[in-house]
Design a protein with these regions (language model features):
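Structural marker of alpha-solenoid helical repeat scaffolds
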Residues: 49, 85, 119-120, 153-154, ...
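Structural signature of tandem alpha-helical TPR/SEL1-like repeats
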Residues: 33-44, 66-81, 102-115, 138-145, ...
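Extracellular and organelle-lumenal recognition/adhesion modules and their flexible linkers in secreted
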Residues: 4-28, 32-34, 156, 160, ...
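Alpha-solenoid helical repeat scaffolds
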Residues: 58-59, 91-95, 124-130, 145, ...
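Short extracytoplasmic
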Residues: 43-69
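Canonical positions in the second alpha-helix
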Residues: 45-46, 81-82, 115-116, 150, ...
């Protein structure tokens, strides 16, 4: 009998506990469900059902804060209520920091921000929000330190990080030191190129070199950019770094077309079309393994400039461009010419027409005072004659350029 009574008592207690647990689970579940609502009434209901639901209390505080419903004291109390349930809730500390700075309590805002800072670890979203608050408080160092982590963790935010850094900090050295990690350096270099901040690129490139250097794609993009800005000396140094085993002292790179052109930097740019084909001839050549062959289809009166290379020169100096060329059955009087040009300047050879065996030619020119680079290449100008559909083949090999003598200044 006693055992039975004991059993019944234990069963009753367990039943009561189970009912209580179920009720608590239901209450907690309903509160949690309401806590995800953007409706203030449902959020208030969630807090009434379960005051321990820190998420619900925070969301209610945040909603009142953003919509400016109720006074700051009530919103502040809600933030603190959420923290009483979870003191490590970084979003509540950030909310307090923003509330305080909005109401002019900068010291309290900074204290709350520091509390949040110690709890965020490496969350990009929270660090981003913290950065914005730090900027408002004038703590640029903290803001940039946070943005450094954001840029490293979230590639999609890197451009915004760099934009904000330049908008707020303005000092390139500070931005590079505090907001740009080694991992982000290539992306930052690309950003500086896109936004045309030439002076700021040099320390970035130097730091890249100290950390193993950039890949060839980034190096080529930077070399192209520097050439476009007129800094051919640095661009040539970068080019030499891409091809450390090659002789980069020659003014014309890959003059024998022994390597497939990359189409960037100081290498050849070779384009093809339906009417003009470009390939390499391993049998017809003057030196090395192959020559460049151009073949015109005879279907079009082309205006063509499909082979070119940028060459660094000293403005005001004299140069001689030499090459070997041959032709076969090139029709029309407007044949193929070799040309050198830059802004407002052009020198060109006599056109190649008909058929001719290999022959050496030379073109001398003086680099204009405003041209740190010239472009050398092949050209076929569109013809205005009735017989204008060009066909035939042209070969080019052993292209070289040498400096002859500097221009002498004229007497006054």
């Amino acid at each position: 009998m006693r055992k039975r009574l004991r059993y019944l008592g234990q069963t009753t207690v367990l039943s009561v506990l189970s009912v209580g647990a179920c009720a608590l689970a239901v209450v907690t579940g309903v509160s949690a469900m309401y806590s995800f609502s953007e409706n203030p009434e449902l959020l208030e209901r969630s807090v009434e059902i379960d005051a321990r639901n820190s998420d619900a209390v925070y969301r209610l505080a945040r909603l009142r804060h953003l919509e400016m419903t109720g006074d700051d004291g009530e919103t502040e109390a809600l933030y603190f209520e959420s923290l009483s349930g979870n003191p490590l809730m970084a979003v509540s500390w950030l909310g307090l920091s923003e509330l305080y700075i909005d109401s002019g309590r900068e010291a309290d805002s900074e204290t709350s921000l520091r509390m949040a800072q110690g709890m965020m670890q490496s969350s990009p979203g929270l660090l981003w929000e913290s950065s914005m608050l730090a900027f408002r408080l004038g703590d640029n160092d903290l803001a940039l330190d946070n943005l450094r982590v954001v840029a490293e963790a979230d590639p999609a935010k890197r451009k915004r990080v760099f934009d904000i850094g330049w908008c707020v900090a303005k000092d390139p050295e500070t931005i590079l030191e505090r907001a740009v990690s080694d991992e982000v350096l290539p992306a930052y270099l690309g950003y500086l190129i896109q936004t045309d901040r030439q002076d700021a690129t040099y320390p970035v490139w130097e730091r890249l070199g100290q950390n193993g250097g950039a890949d060839d794609e980034a190096a080529l993009a930077y070399a192209d950019y520097l050439v476009s800005k007129g800094d051919t000396e640095t661009a040539r140094d970068i080019w030499a770094g891409i091809y450390p085993g090659e002789d980069v002292s020659a003014l014309v790179w890959n003059g024998g077309f022994e390597y497939d052109p990359v189409g960037r930097g100081f290498d050849w740019r070779v384009s093809r079309s339906d009417s003009v084909d470009a390939d390499y001839d391993y049998r017809k050549k003057t030196e090395g393994y192959r020559s460049l062959r151009i073949k015109f289809s005879g279907k079009e009166n082309v205006d063509w400039k499909g082979v070119s290379q940028t060459v660094a020169v000293n403005p005001g100096s004299h140069y001689a461009l030499t090459w070997e060329a041959a032709s076969s059955d090139i029709t029309t009087r407007n044949g193929v010419t070799v040309e050198v040009y830059c802004r407002g300047f052009k020198a060109e050879s006599e056109p190649y027409t008909g058929s001719s065996d290999w022959e050496s030619r030379r073109l001398e020119f003086a680099a204009p005072d405003d041209c740190p680079t010239v472009t050398i290449g092949l050209r076929r100008e569109k013809s205005d004659r009735l017989d204008n559909l060009i066909s035939g083949e042209f070969w080019l090999d052993d292209v070289r350029m040498t400096k002859t003598e500097d221009r002498r200044p004229t007497d006054a």
